[in-house]
From Swiss-Prot:
It is found in: Virion; Host cytoplasm. The keyword RNA-binding applies. This is Nucleoprotein. GO terms for cellular component: helical viral capsid; host cell cytoplasm; ribonucleoprotein complex; viral nucleocapsid. Pfam families: Rhabdo_ncap. Gene3D superfamilies: Nucleoprotein, Rhabdovirus nucleocapsid protein like domain. The lineage of its organism: Viruses, Riboviria, Orthornavirae, Negarnaviricota, Haploviricotina. It comes from Vesicular stomatitis Indiana virus (strain 94GUB Central America).
């Protein structure tokens, strides 16, 4: 039913509206309704030997072409194969049948890249032995380039160097420290499709001898799906099922975002799906599962997790422009309910020596909180408290955050510390 808004002075009817300044989300299933292939554009006019030299010298000089990188990766990886032990399909695309031997690029549709190939500097000293570590290095730079935090960036680069040295003991980094020529590679759709294809392939063939190539590609999986990760983290830290966690959603904004994420038919729970790579495969330009598109859910879930002593939640990003008051209260109530009850039950017995709980709780006052985690009981109790956090709830939250130190600005940890440790 529509609501009519009138100006009191003259009964003029107005229709309040906000500007449509955000792009709508795009679901992976919708992509495959329009197209049955993921095109990958590669220039294949140069030999692998030439491309190997172009990439090697280009990295050392700081003037490498992403077209050379993509062409080299294709040439070096196209013969890697794996044998399926089960049928593999996703969104109606038949990738392979059980017993088939498939390659990385069977996940995409190869197309010729038109245009003139940039010049490159040859290097006759480079051999096919480089193909055992150079693809790992090129793919690893994708992961390094995605972070701008200097300490973490150095840690990732050191890890990449160690991975390459495990293959070639004489390996030395080709990109000098401080040079960031590879940061923009993530803007090239063909490069990101190669990254996604490599990770999806080795996720299926985890024991493949080249599976270490996932060092750099693993961040492509569930990219821009932070809110979905929040849901999974909340289920783990509460020890509750997805259904039970969902019943604890008490805010309309969170419910709307949950419904957005749980749209049927998106293969969220299918491990070998294209879905986790919706961004890098170009299936979606606006993920329905990101913290940007689900700020209320992300905040509520991470705050609840933090109050349940999650170390991971402390550095979660604090969204802007959300209804903090109600979301904070909802997160506090949920965390207090879980933290005040232990979901303990005898799991095994010897003979018939089983504990039978006494249903007679007796001795409880009307002001005492429920002993379980039933949201209906807790909401009834919260109503009796005039829908305001009790002193014990506030003390519980303070104990959860009082020891937090070194918190970064605009994080859930920083927000909770300032909110509860007063």
């Amino acid at each position: 039913m529509s609501v009519t808004v009138k100006r009191i002075i003259d009964n003029t009817v107005i229709v309040p509206k906000l500007p449509a300044n955000e792009d709508p989300v795009e679901y992976p299933a919708d992509y495959f309704k329009k197209s049955k292939e993921i095109p990958l554009y590669i220039n294949t006019t140069k030999s692998l030997s030439d491309l190997r030299g172009y990439v090697y010298q280009g990295l050392k000089s700081g003037n490498v072409s992403i077209i050379h990188v993509n062409s080299y990766l294709y040439g070096a990886l196209k013969d890697i194969r794996g044998k399926l032990d089960k049928d593999w399909s996703s969104f109606g695309i038949n990738i392979g049948k059980a017993g088939d031997t498939i390659g990385i690029f069977d996940l995409v549709s190869l197309k010729a890249l038109d245009g003139v190939l940039p010049d490159g500097v040859s290097d006759a000293s480079r051999t096919s032995a480089d193909d055992k570590w150079l693809p790992l290095y090129l793919l690893g730079l994708y992961r390094v380039g995605r972070t701008q935090m200097p300490e973490y960036r150095k840690k990732l680069m050191d890890g990449l160097t160690n991975q390459c040295k495990m293959i070639n003991e004489q390996f030395e980094p080709l990109v000098p420290e401080g040079r960031d020529i590879f940061d923009v590679w993530g803007n090239d759709s063909n490069y990101t499709k190669i990254v996604a294809a490599v990770d999806m392939f080795f996720h299926m063939f985890k024991k493949h001898e080249c599976a270490s190539f996932r060092y750099g590609t693993i961040v492509s999986r569930f990219k821009d799906c932070a809110a979905l990760a929040t849901f999974g983290h909340l289920c783990k830290i509460t020890g509750m099922s997805t259904e039970d966690v969902t019943t604890w959603i008490l805010n309309r904004e969170v419910a709307d975002e949950m419904a957005q994420m749980m749209l049927p038919g998106q293969e969220i729970d299918k491990a070998d799906s294209y879905m986790p790579y919706l961004i890098d495969f170009g299936l979606s330009s606006k993920s329905p599962y990101s913290s940007v598109k689900n700020p209320a859910f992300h905040f509520w879930g991470q705050l609840t997790a933090l109050l349940l002593r999650s170390t991971r939640a402390r550095n979660a990003r604090q969204p802007d422009d959300i209804e903090y008051t109600s979301l904070t209260t909802a997160g506090l109530l949920y965390a207090y309910a879980v933290g005040s009850s232990a979901d303990l039950a005898q799991q095994f017995c010897v003979g018939d020596n089983k504990y039978t709980p006494d249903d007679n709780t007796g001795g409880l006052t009307t002001n005492a909180p429920p002993q379980g985690r039933d949201v209906v009981e807790w909401l009834g109790w919260f109503e009796d408290q005039n829908r305001k956090p009790t002193p014990d709830m506030m003390q519980y939250a303070k104990r959860a955050v009082m020891s937090l130190q070194g918190l970064r600005e605009k994080t859930i940890g920083k927000y909770a510390k300032s909110e509860f440790d007063k």
